[in-house]
């Protein structure tokens, strides 16, 4: 990635992200102390304010800040694990709650059965939760969650 | 399998340590406990500790790092828990947690971590800065940068910019910093205690080659440092050529000064003032060296330099 490929969001674009999150998860995310940026493939990143003040234009940048998620059609966003953790604390909608067995399957990359759903809309992206932890995102289909966590983050659990 | 110590290694460390050498050899041939750091950007100690103890893990606080713990389980167990998946802790060798403590990053600062991969110290710095300011986390090995990016993401750090650049050329971008972490590539002899394979690669020729290269890198890094700025020099090497000799070079040739370091609850020694007939600047004694048998950690060398 060249630094020139990083597009810092205006206030208006930031508001749009806040609205998308609010619409999908009924969560009011406080983004007042951070800045947002977008890179190729509609990837959205959260950065500390100071990053925006630094001239990184000449650097060969691999990543900036925290990957929040990827913007999708119809004003939706597929959140990363960290994105789910940030949004999850305030979320009131589109939350799929798992039991222990299914949670273990989920973090290994498998699709899972949902124990309890909180206002989950069919075929929507949902936050996957086990006890107090948000494990990542998936797609809610027929009371199941299709696992959408990136392969690089999956784990093989010990016995 | 037992660690085979090379005769030249033994000769060298008998010269440095005298009677204490036997203690070093004993620890090198044993296994030291694994350690990790709780990620307070994501979870509090109060929340995570009971969860880890429920697994039957026996934790022992690392006395020099508030959120560092020793644990006596194999690494493969540490990387296969839901808490690891969620980024609630970071596996890091206990001595490797010291250089960021010396750098003392503060919220809002702009810091350069010149050899950042795989990200242990980068994430520690990001955490100490409470996710504010900027850490430019640079490296030059793409494979290692991939691990760095994954670790920074798993850690939940928002204040890191990961860059790909040969450290010799970083100054050409014109950016200047008040604080630089210079945790340079080295022969790794301090890591023999955790990675016996390094003993096989250990040779005086390799040490001399590394030392020469480190001086080139150091001279370039100093160009990125503001006047009065701090550069923390660290290696996981125990070799005087890669440590005191390079600090002597920084003082006499690059014009930097060495500041005194104090780390509470850690056993360490002063930098050497002489080795194999070579005399170093007196201020080199302000650097610290840690041997594996001092605290049951990897060997480390750390020095705080001011421009």
Identify what each model region corresponds to.
Chain B
Residues 1-307:
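S-adenosylmethionine
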């Amino acid at each position: 990635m060249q630094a020139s490929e990083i597009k810092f969001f205006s206030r208006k674009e930031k508001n749009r992200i806040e609205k998308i999150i609010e619409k999908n998860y009924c969560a009011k995310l406080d983004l007042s102390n951070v800045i947002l940026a977008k890179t190729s493939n509609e990837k959205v990143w959260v950065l500390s304010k100071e990053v925006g003040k630094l001239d990184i234009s000449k650097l060969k940048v691999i990543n900036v800040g925290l990957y929040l998620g990827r913007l999708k059609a119809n004003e939706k966003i597929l959140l990363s694990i960290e994105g789910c953790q940030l949004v999850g604390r305030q979320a009131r909608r589109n939350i799929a709650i798992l039991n222990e067995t299914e949670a273990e399957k989920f973090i290994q990359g498998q699709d899972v059965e949902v124990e309890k759903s909180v206002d989950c809309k069919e075929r929507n992206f949902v936050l996957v939760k086990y006890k107090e932890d948000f494990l990542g995102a998936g797609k809610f289909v027929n009371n199941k969650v299709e696992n959408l966590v990136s392969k690089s983050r999956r784990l093989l659990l010990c016995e | 399998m037992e660690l085979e110590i090379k005769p030249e290694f033994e000769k060298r460390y008998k010269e440095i340590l005298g009677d204490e050498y036997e203690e070093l050899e004993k620890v090198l041939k044993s296994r030291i406990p694994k350690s990790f750091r709780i990620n307070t950007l994501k979870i509090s100690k109060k929340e995570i500790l009971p969860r880890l103890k429920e697994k039957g893990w026996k934790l022992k606080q690392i006395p020099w790092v508030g959120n560092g713990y020793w644990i006596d389980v194999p690494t493969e167990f540490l990387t296969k828990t839901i808490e690891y998946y969620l980024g609630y802790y970071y596996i890091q060798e206990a001595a490797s947690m010291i250089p960021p403590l010396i750098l003392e990053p503060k919220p809002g600062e702009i810091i350069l971590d010149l050899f950042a991969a795989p990200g242990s110290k980068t994430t520690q710095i990001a955490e100490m800065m409470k996710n504010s300011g900027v850490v430019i986390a640079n490296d030059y090995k793409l494979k290692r940068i991939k691990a760095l990016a994954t670790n920074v993401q798993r850690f939940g750090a928002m204040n890191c910019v990961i860059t790909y650049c040969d450290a010799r050329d970083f100054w050409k971008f014109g950016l200047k910093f008040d604080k630089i972490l210079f945790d340079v590539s080295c022969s790794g002899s301090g890591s023999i205690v955790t990675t016996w394979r390094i003993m096989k690669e250990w040779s005086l020729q390799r040490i001399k080659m590394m030392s020469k290269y480190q001086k080139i890198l150091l001279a370039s890094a100093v160009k990125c440092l503001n006047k009065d700025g701090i550069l923390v020099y660290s290696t996981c090497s125990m070799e005087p050529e890669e440590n005191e000799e390079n600090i002597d070079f920084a003082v006499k040739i690059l014009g930097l000064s060495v500041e005194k370091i104090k780390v509470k609850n850690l056993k360490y020694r002063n930098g050497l003032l002489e080795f194999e007939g070579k005399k170093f600047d007196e201020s080199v004694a302000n650097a610290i060296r840690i041997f594996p048998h001092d605290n049951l950690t990897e060997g480390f060398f750390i020095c705080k330099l001011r421009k």
